[in-house]
Amino acid sequence: MLYIEVLLLAIGLSMDSLAVSVTGGAVLKNNCTAGNIIKIASVLGIFQAGMTVIGYTMGLGFEKYICAFDHWIAFTLLLYLGGKMIYDSTKEEEEDGKFDPLCNRTLCGLGIATSIDALAVGISLAILKSPLLLQASTIGVVTFAISAFGVYFGNRFGKRIDLKLDLIGGLILIGIGTKILIEHLFFS
């Protein structure tokens, strides 16, 4: 696999993380520090790279079992997180219980949900016998960079437009989950 192909693959895999990070940045409001941007982007990048490695090591032997339910895991996680964001957006402006993209549990859930495709890609890379270190590190670094941009962009955009960004973000997460489910059920 040529490096440009690896780069394009990494960009494609990071699009779900971009959507999540834009939403996270919008929710952060005045708490969008460099450290928080790095935290969100790092978790999303590490999960993308890590799931690629896990998928690669599982290889061909487990492909049929993983592919049977990976889309349900991603759908369920994104539906839950999106639903929570929508629910929180309808409540009064209290800070307790609001969607918090810095909460470790929420961030890990988002990391898993947005990197399920990387698991399948890892399995495919094992089939192709592609060099794992190059693939996984490129996927992780690209996802980190795109996610960092997403958090920053979401924060700047969210400050200029006073919308219910929790509601929009929740709908985006549910949309991503639904897209993953439909693709796997009807187009794979």
Swiss-Prot record:
Taxonomy, superkingdom: Bacteria
A molecular-function term among this protein's GO annotations: manganese ion transmembrane transporter activity
Subcellular location: Cell inner membrane
Topological relation to the membrane, as annotated: Multi-pass membrane protein
Keywords, alphabetical: Cell inner membrane, Cell membrane, Ion transport, Manganese, Membrane, Transmembrane, Transmembrane helix, Transport
GO CC aspect terms: plasma membrane
Pfam families linked to this entry: Mntp
Transmembrane segments: 2-22, 40-60, 66-86, 107-127, 133-153, 167-187
UniProt keyword annotation of Endoplasmic reticulum present: no
PANTHER family, A to Z: MANGANESE EFFLUX PUMP MNTP-RELATED
Family as reported in the entry's similarity comment: Belongs to the MntP (TC 9.B.29) family.
Record HAMAP family: MntP_pump
Function: Probably functions as a manganese efflux pump.
Name of protein: Putative manganese efflux pump MntP
Source organism of this protein record: Parabacteroides distasonis (strain ATCC 8503 / DSM 20701 / CIP 104284 / JCM 5825 / NCTC 11152)
Organism lineage string: Bacteria, Pseudomonadati, Bacteroidota, Bacteroidia, Bacteroidales
Gene field: mntP
